[in-house]
Design a protein with these regions (language model features):
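Class I S-adenosyl-L-methionine
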Residues: 1-113, 122, 144
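Beta-strand/loop-alpha-helix module characteristic of Rossmann-like adenine-cofactor folds
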Residues: 2-18, 105, 122-185
Length: 185
C-alpha cells in the first residue's frame, strides 16, 4: 500500500486472523464467522480448510496459504486494495509462528484483528514461567523436520517442539537421540 492508502485505511480491519488448534469441531469458529464483517473470503492451510469447511457460507472463496507465500500475499494485497475483508485461519497464535508477522512485514498498513489460540508451548512457558525467548520453538506440524534438525545440531539448550498427533512421541524422541546421542530423557 502507498502512504496515502495507508493513511486512508488507518483503523480499518482488512484481515481477521483466527488462531486454531487441531480440534475437528471448534466451537469458536462458527461464532466468529457469524459475528465479524467479512466478504466471504477465507484463507488458511489445507488442514484448516477441512476443519472450517462446515462453517463456511456456500459462496465462500478460499485462498490456500501455501508456498510460495508471495503468491498468497499478492492475492491478499489485491483483495485489500479492492476493499475486501479476509478471514484467515492459522494454527495457534498468529504472531507466535509468524503468519501475522509476515503480513505485517509485507503488507504495510494492513489492519488486522487477531484472535490467538495459545499452543501447548505457550501454555507450558506460562505455567513454568519461561520467557518465550528462552525456548527455541520449532513446529513440525504439517512441515518437514529441517528446523528441528537444525535446532538439535546447534545444541539449543531448550527446544520446544509443536507436532501433530503423528509422528508419535517415541518417534520424536528417537529423532532427537539420533542427532544428539548425549541427550537424556
Amino acid at each position: 500500500m502507498r502512504t496515502q492508502e495507508i493513511v486512508e485505511a488507518y483503523g480499518k480491519t482488512h484481515i481477521y486472523m483466527i488462531g486454531m488448534d487441531d480440534n475437528p469441531q471448534p466451537k469458536h469458529i462458527e461464532v466468529i464467522i457469524k459475528n465479524v464483517k467479512h466478504d466471504n473470503i477465507f484463507s488458511g492451510g489445507k488442514r484448516h480448510y477441512e476443519i472450517v469447511k462446515p462453517f463456511l457460507p456456500a459462496d465462500a472463496v478460499w485462498i490456500e496459504i501455501k508456498a510460495p507465500i508471495n503468491a498468497v500475499l499478492t492475492e491478499y494485497s489485491r483483495l485489500i486494495q479492492e476493499g475486501k475483508v479476509i478471514v484467515s485461519f492459522v494454527s495457534g497464535d498468529p504472531f507466535f509462528f509468524g503468519f501475522a508477522s509476515t503480513i505485517r512485514k509485507n503488507l504495510l498498513g494492513v489492519g488486522m484483528k487477531v484472535f490467538p489460540y495459545f499452543n501447548s508451548l505457550q501454555m507450558f512457558a506460562h505455567h513454568e514461567q519461561i520467557p518465550y525467548e528462552n525456548m527455541h520453538a520449532v513446529s513440525v506440524t504439517g512441515r518437514p523436520w529441517h528446523e528441528l534438525d537444525r535446532a538439535l545440531l546447534e545444541y539449543r539448550p531448550l527446544i520446544g517442539v509443536l507436532t501433530d498427533r503423528a509422528p508419535s512421541a517415541r518417534c520424536r524422541r528417537s529423532k532427537c537421540l539420533s542427532i544428539s546421542p548425549s541427550t537424556t530423557t
